[in-house]
Amino acid sequence: PPGKDGKVNPNILAAAYVAGVKEIYKVGGAQGIAMLAYGTESVEPVFKIVGPGNAFVAMAKRLVFGTVGIDMIAGPSEVCCVADGADPTWIAADLLSQAEHDPRAAVFLITPDADFGKKVEAEMERQMKELSRYEIMKSSVDDYAKAFLCKDAAQCFDIVNKIAPEHLEVELPDPKQYLPLIYNAGAIFLGKYTSEPLGDYMAGPNHTLPTSGTAAFSSPLGVYDFVKHSSVEMYNKEAFQKISKKVQIFAKAEGLTAHAHAMEVRDED
């Protein structure tokens, strides 16, 4: 989509060139989704639309699903941090890195240490005042920030799996040991040096991620979203004869006599 000056960000154009993109359309919003889904006199309709957008884009993607494929319905950004014994300054900074996205961005802190939680809260208040998007962060933190005090790691990750966050930071000693406890999260960041903005820009995995709890049943965008496959079956006569009667039993149990008949006529061969 173009900026307020009507131009496409040159950094996006450069990235598209490096990626080998052949066509670029300077359009955004719900109207851009409609254009791609249904086509125009100058634009051919596409098979699939992917990527995040505002609430209007999200609703437009929902409406055109079925005419085209989509990746997901993305909502406001969210980050969840499970931490104990970490630097509260670092944790606060990571939480604010998502709060600055949107007044409705959600930030969660899960910890077994109440004093640590208070230090993180104080750090967030201090750091917000020094950053340029203060009003956005303030709205996010006031309305959508939650802290959970847990008795142990198992309870921490039980809460994580209920939230199913878009981004999950695990800043505990030996963080890899907790991976088997994590079932629902879009992207998982392990260790104190794996700050969430690394995933936004440089880490490698695609950062279009399921939000609003949909990580419980959805995965990040990946190359598999741009491919599809077909199943292929082939029986010879011997294989058919071994299984024909069983197929007929299933078909008749469902009352689908034409299915059974398609098997029976071959039994006579």
PLM regions: where:
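Residues at or immediately preceding the N-termini of alpha-helices
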Residues: 88, 114, 152-155, 175-176, ...
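Structural motif
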Residues: 22-25, 46-50, 54-55, 71, ...
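Short acidic loop-to-helix transition motifs that present clustered carboxylates
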Residues: 4-8, 27-35, 175
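C-terminal core of ALDH-fold dehydrogenases
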Residues: 161-269
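Conserved NAD(P)+-binding/catalytic subdomain of aldehyde/semialdehyde dehydrogenases
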Residues: 15-106
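Glycine-rich, Lys/Arg-enriched anion-binding loops that position phosphate/diphosphate groups
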Residues: 128-169, 173-174
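A conserved active-site cap/scaffold subdomain adjacent to cofactor or substrate pockets
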Residues: 72-143, 147
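Active-site-proximal loop->helix
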Residues: 4-19
